[in-house]
Amino acid sequence: MAQSSTSHDSGPQGLMRRPSRSAATTVSIEVFDHEVVPASLGTIAPILRVAAEIEHERPRVAYLCRFYAFEKAHRLDPSSGGRGVRQFKTLLFQRLERDNASSLASRVKKTDGREVESFYQQYYEHYVRALDQGDQADRAQLGKAYQTAGVLFEVLMAVNKSEKVEAVAPEIIAAARDVQEKNEIYAPYNILPLDSAGASQSVMQLEEVKAAVAALGNTRGLNWPSGFEQHRKKTGNLDLLDWLRAMFGFQRDNVRNQREHLVCLFADNHIRLTPKPEPLNKLDDRAVDTVMSKLFKNYKNWCKFLGRKHSLRLPQAAQDIQQRKILYMGLYLLIWGEAANIRFMPECLCYIFHNMAYELHGLLAGNVSIVTGENIKPSYGGDDEAFLRKVITPIYRVVQTEANKNANGKAAHSDWSNYDDLNEYFWTPDCFSLGWPMRDDGDLFKSTRDTTQGKKGSFRKAGRTGKSNFTETRTFWHIYHSFDRLWTFYLLALQAMIILAFERVELREILRKDVLYALSSIFITAAFLRFLQSVLDVILNFPGFHRWKFTDVLRNILKIVVSLAWCVVLPLCYAQSVSFAPGKLKQWLSFLPQVKGVPPLYIMAVALYLLPNVLAAIMFIFPMLRRWIENSDWHIFRLLLWWSQPRIYVGRGMHESQIALIKYTIFWLLLFCCKFAFSYFLQVKLLVKPTNAIMSIRHVKYKWHEFFPNAEHNYGAVVSLWLPVILVYFMDTQIWYAIFSTICGGVIGAFDRLGEIRTLGMLRSRFQSLPGAFNTYLVPSDKTRRRGFSLSKRFAEVTAARRTEAAKFSQLWNEIISSFREEDLISDREMDLLLVPYTSDPSLKLIQWPPFLLASKIPIALDMAAQFRTRDSDLWKRICADEYMKCAVIECYESFKHVLHTLVIGENEKRIIGIIIKEVESNISKNSFLSNFRMAPLPALCSKFVELVGILKNADPAKRDTVVLLLQDMLEVVTRDMMQNENRELVELGHTNKESGRQLFAGTDAKPAILFPPVATAQWHEQISRLHLLLTVKESAMDVPTNLEAQRRIAFFTNSLFMDMPRAPRVRNMLSFSVLTPYYSEETVYSKNDLEMENEDGVSVVYYLQKIFPDEWTNFLERLDCKDETSVLESEENILQLRHWVSLRGQTLFRTVRGMMYYRRALKLQAFLDMANETEILAGYKAISEPTEEDKKSQRSLYTQLEAVADLKFTYVATCQNYGNQKRSGDRRATDILNLMVNNPSLRVAYIDEVEEREGGKVQKVFYSVLIKAVDNLDQEIYRIKLPGPAKIGEGKPENQNHALIFTRGEALQAIDMNQDHYLEEALKMRNLLEEFNEDHGVRAPTILGFREHIFTGSVSSLAWFMSNQETSFVTIGQRVLASPLKVRFHYGHPDVFDRIFHITRGGISKASRGINLSEDIFAGFNSTLRRGNVTHHEYIQVGKGRDVGLNQISLFEAKVACGNGEQTLSRDLYRLGHRFDFFRMMSCYFTTVGFYISSMIVVLTVYAFLYGRLYLSLSGVEEAIVKFAAAKGDSSLKAAMASQSVVQLGLLMTLPMVMEIGLERGFRTALSDLIIMQLQLAPVFFTFSLGTKVHYYGRTILHGGSKYRATGRGFVVKHEKFAENYRMYSRSHFVKGMELMVLLICYRIYGKAAEDSVGYALVMGSTWFLVGSWLFAPFFFNPSGFEWQKIVDDWDDWNKWISSRGGIGVPANKSWESWWEEEQEHLLHSGFFGKFWEIFLSLRYFIYQYGIVYQLNLTKESRMGKQHSIIVYGLSWLVIVAVMIVLKIVSMGRKKFSADFQLMFRLLKLFLFIGSVVIVGMLFHFLKLTVGDIMQSLLAFLPTGWALLQISQVARPLMKTVGMWGSVKALARGYEYIMGVVIFMPVTVLAWFPFVSEFQTRLLFNQAFSRGLQIQRILAGGKKQK
């Protein structure tokens, strides 16, 4: 795309774009020619590329190339059947017609054939040969030259054929042969040029690479197929992987890819060995064994689990063992590299490898087949795609067919088999029934292989693949099913507390026999709960019964029978033992007599029942025993485990060490002490007295028709009282967890030394230790250091004598500061103040600190010295009191001497200066300086010197005379004013000068006295600039750098060096790693149009960012040397810089790539410090980082060696899956991605290429995984690996990652999202972090290294700030506690670093089943933990992360996370963790994953339970009876219980961890002020609103499914959202629920009789009204310009238009209410039976309003004369509903029949209906005493009923449509939406009347910006003023 910059007005050169219906049509002006080629014509792209390249040189040859391309396109697709082919041919033909005449005119030779031939010869001789024979050939240029020559020869042959020229000159044929051979050799490569031409490359000269390549090349003793044998003899460079390809039919590029992969792995492990291998260029067996053990650990475990012997059989001969091991590893990686989506099924890969490795062994051992009697041959082999076609594709087809049954996420999980189901088939020995070669009739293939019967080809119905060990059923029962031990524990504890409370037992009496007997009834409850779990095991997993084995069925039946037996035995024994059991029952149980001396039968039964729990307790206390038993093959242990849990491959032996167990057990025991003390004393015990009182009330006067008027004990009232309390009891552990984790995280963070350096002042105080810290942690050392906590961190001070160490510090520090300047965080002046001299002056005997530490020290020292009158030692002591002042004084003095020595060259002058300096230093050494020198003139001397330095800095030759005068002045000041005694030598020299007749320092042209201007070297310029700063900066540099982000980064980085981290190894010895970034189609780089585009307020992105980042904008202008924005826009280069500047402040791929490429920059710098000698280090890294052309070409230069090491250790792959399509369609993003590759040569892009290929006359799509890099401003293909089908068949993001995973390298892999950023100073610590893989972290080595993130989007608005704080606390304090002590950290986002080999052999770094793995990342953590991994968390390194900044984007994000958690609740992974963890770790797992969402749901349910309970009490009349009873008895506790309930809003607790983390890192005063500001900015409103989002989407996902990936905006949000948009977004999740709660509160206010004056009542009602207000109005509070009158008017018009608009096919939801309404209930169409049942059941609650309120009406008082209220009243009230329905139906039918043609008739109909309604209401007023109050109450009664009917109708949609009522339902729904819209909109409108509300809201919303002096009003009100 180098030629892609052709502008629109480029005239005839560009092809004009034609409009087309198809989005995939392939042509665009910007990137035509060689890039935009239809998918089916990919092979002609190189020809068009060559044409574009040579066009300026030989237009005719370019024309002939295009003509040949046109012919070839016609040959490939004669009928133009491929997509976009016809348009492409047309445009190409038009171009040919246009260019023909002009190119013919410029032809040099007579014929076209001669023209091409002469150009070919010229190109070959003058370019190709010249390049090839050069001393230092550029490999990339050579490769490209050979490819071009190959294309030209192809064109030459075609032209000769058309001109019927038969003979081609022999020298051309010879050249073509040479080109063809070299083309194969100079193939594009990724990191290592593993062909014969690449041997001279620097990376191939590394000893470890040589060793690995040599080991792969050892093909001794292998038999090659005949075709390969000839090739091998000819080239001699085939290796072991080529042999595997020949035998098993792998793809060529797969082999090339895995060859490099294997070489990198071997080289990496080989160089790290200790002791070092001898010789270094021979691959050590230890390196091979290390890689092999990692690669095959899972495979060996799998074989052991299935009781099979593994196939890794080694030969007897020692010399062949290494070769055999490499063959096995190569085979596995080749299988993995071609497995595509099957990589998500690791045990399926184990099965394939098991059989192929067995065949490999047979091949090499010469085994004979038992069946055929011949030598064993591979079952699948032959051509290059045999393995893909015969092994992978059949399995892929099964996976694809099952995925298609998912119906795009709409089908139930039980209807199809996901990746896990299919993989788990290979956890059973049944998988071997597939055989090898695999039989098509094996179980796995039943779903797709229909077997033909008979000649007519009738089909047998396909068998079902079926679910495996688990079925994801949509039900809330999963919450109990997955965490049954937790709920059992809570229920038993609750039962025990209730027993103690009602028995009024004091805690000290708990060991009384009768109390213990009463408490022992909990075991009966436990037995029933266990029975429930056994039943759920069968019911929830029943859809997978096809795959159940007999042992599974037996186990389930036995468990149900045994648990049922206990449910009978325990109650019977208990009843027989207790005294209060009925006498008849005791007689009936007389067959259970007690024998004397034997304990009671119940006690024995309980002991027997608890026996298995004793065993479990022993295994809990000794986790090592549990691990051993779970991994054991002993049958007794298998039987034991078979009963307690099904035997599955994962989840075994994952228990932690004894110490870890003790830590998290203590955490939970302390938490439970607090939780149960609170629950018992403040919840359960307080309700005992009110409960007894309520149950003792008789004679309740009911206000409605009571169905059970004579029922005793008022159970309804008791339930209303207890239900909210019990719900809070189940939820409040989450609150206690928040408190305890905050305290625990704070303590751990403090011990981790977080926040020790948090301000610039703290940094200054610790700066002297910094060089030591740098050299300890960032510079490798041979000394080993013990890790661990110490109270103080001390580092050996780097003294001036240790110059190399000081130089290393300066290189690292300066590179960090330079990166700050590049990012525009600091200005040029600040950079100068922060830099340390790159090249230290050998004459200085001290460390040169950065000037910002020494600023203003010299002026202060001068003032001090000028006024000092006492002894020298006192003055020096005062100066030395400030270490930096001492350094500044010494450095300035030494620099003063250095300047004079450099400047003065006259003999006499040099002697004079020497005498003065000698005199000064002599006096200093004798402590007599102050007595012999006057100090008062010192400032005058200094000012002269400052002037001199200023002149030297600019080095203007015209100022020579001024320099002479200054030197004379300075000499005079010293000799006349300062020296008290005359120096004899000076006098003599003065006399000598008089005699010569010239003045001092003046000199002559022949004999100058001074050298001015001095010789300008970089070192001289640096020294003079620094000296000038030290002398002139008078103000303190306390606030340097001024930028807050720069301050934060420096503070965190320096603080992290005082934390505990591993020492860094040398770069060559470090673990190599890759970074993988999934990218779909988000923003890459903002275009110029994006920058200039204004929103509705006239604000452009550039203007916005100028106001948000004013200091960075100023620094940017300074860097470009521009005055303002106008001058920036004058140059194309500056516009590009501006685009980059803006893109680096958004969430773009450009920002992410820049951040990740810091890794490479850091590695090169660190490798320089490792590899450079002392001279090179003292000369500085700058000399290397700006190499000469010679250095770049030389393979021996230090520069190329650094490049080689960086290449080997770091790979960055951006997986841009749509790049191919974007390129073909001319999408700007493709050009941006190419530019990224050009600017970052080591960046690789992986994409999925869809190519149309013709097979058997049919065009079909073929998919490839392609890896590309940039060469010579074009993208160049490195590998192209064919896939069995489309890569995306499940969740898109994990499958995008998966396809690119094969192109990553190294032993660690970092997953980075494209909204992340990185910093150079953090990248420097990557080596340290990777060493954590080798550190001791408990029983198991780490498999995922987690670390913290900094949220960089928090500075814009209050919302962004809340979100930023919330996210920051989660990724720091939250995950710190999860990792230690709780040991349940998983994988939550994307800075985590994976143990790559561990994960690629166990299913990858995410899971991809549609729907269930919506939160794909956390499943990587689940999978890692279940497969005995270990996830850690580290605080000393961080990356940047962007978050959504507008309320709607935040809500979309939270909806996505809530849906993901809903799916997790149903998942097998969580079920297995819940059952395989020990009890306390299971508690941790629950409360840190789905437990938070369940607790949030319980909070909302508590509010509902409380209010509906109150509604029941008030409407039924029970509450009035209770209040009267309490008043009569004087029972205050009963009154209080009625008035208050424990209603807690969990959202407010989100601030706890935030406050702790801010306190730790920025000080507790800051934390407190931030907390207060957050409250003032309505943070509680935001968190309460978020609670509603979480609960709605979590609950809906579990009930109905329909979860999907929700793309959230990543843009800059200062945008007003329209009311209609907010309504669509929040109607169902917040507004409906808020309205319902509001109606409940109003009803209770009207009918309630509880004590309204109590504080408890006020608190509860206040908090509930706050919840309602938050849910209804938060979207308006947090909407920019939400209360601006004009916007309100526009919003209302827009909403009216939207709600009135009719829907229809193709009408989007944002244009029509009908379309939106249909979309909103779509989930009900696909919901299961239970989902629909619960939806209807929950809707029934709305009927209680009508039932209760109709009996309160004035109208019905007549019917209340009797003792009982008649049910007829309620029945008659339904007539109103029926009447309304009839009216609606009449209107609906009338509209259909009359509205179009008989408008008058329709109006008359509506008039009659209106008159009729008025007449009926009037009669009711007159005859039945109806009042206005009755009408208002009726609305409260009937509106909820109508809503209930509407909800039920939506569920019963098919029925409604059948009976013809759907139109009425729609009309009713629209009416309700109108009412809801008006109710919500009215208060907003009223507030908008007052202008100050809008101003207040803006201030509230953008306070963060205001505090930094920003003017958001101008941004909102219009940047138009700027124009």
Curated annotation (Swiss-Prot):
Effect of deleting the gene: Plants develop deformed and inviable pollen grains which do not have exin.
Matches recorded under Pfam families: FKS1_dom1, Glucan_synthase, Vta1
A GO molecular-function descriptor: 1,3-beta-D-glucan synthase activity
First-level EC class: transferase
Catalytic activity annotation: [(1->3)-beta-D-glucosyl](n) + UDP-alpha-D-glucose = [(1->3)-beta-D-glucosyl](n+1) + UDP + H(+)
Disulfide bonds: none
Effect seen on changing residue 651 to I: In cals5-4; loss of exine
Transmembrane segments: 482-502, 522-542, 560-580, 602-622, 659-679, 720-740, 1487-1507, 1536-1556, 1567-1587, 1631-1651, 1658-1678, 1733-1755, 1767-1787, 1804-1824, 1826-1846, 1874-1894
Cytoplasmic topology ranges: 1-481, 543-559, 623-658, 741-1486, 1557-1566, 1652-1657, 1756-1766, 1825, 1895-1923
The UniProt record lists the keyword Protein biosynthesis: no
Residue ranges, annotated region (Disordered): 1-22
Lineage, opening ranks: Eukaryota, Viridiplantae, Streptophyta, Embryophyta, Tracheophyta
EC number(s) reported in the record: 2.4.1.34
Protein name (database record): Callose synthase 5
Subcellular localization, as worded in the UniProt entry: Cell membrane
Role noted for this protein: Required for the formation of the callose wall separating the tetraspores (interstitial wall) and surrounding the pollen mother cells (peripheral wall). Required for exine formation on pollen wall. May be involved in callose synthesis during pollen tube growth. During plant growth and development, callose is found as a transitory component of the cell plate in dividing cells, is a major component of pollen mother cell walls and pollen tubes, and is found as a structural component of plasmodesmatal canals.
Positions annotated with a glycan in the UniProt record: 1710
InterPro entries given in the database record: FKS1-like_dom1, Glyco_trans_48_dom, Vta1/CALS_N, Vta1/CALS_N_sf
Annotated Gene Ontology cellular component terms: 1,3-beta-D-glucan synthase complex; plasma membrane
SMART domains documented for this protein: FKS1_dom1
Keyword flag Oxidoreductase: no
Residues exposed to the Extracellular side: 503-521, 581-601, 680-719, 1508-1535, 1588-1630, 1679-1732, 1788-1803, 1847-1873
Main location as per UniProt: membrane
Biased composition (Polar residues): 1-10
The organism's place on the tree of life at top rank: Eukaryota
Family, per entry: Belongs to the glycosyltransferase 48 family.
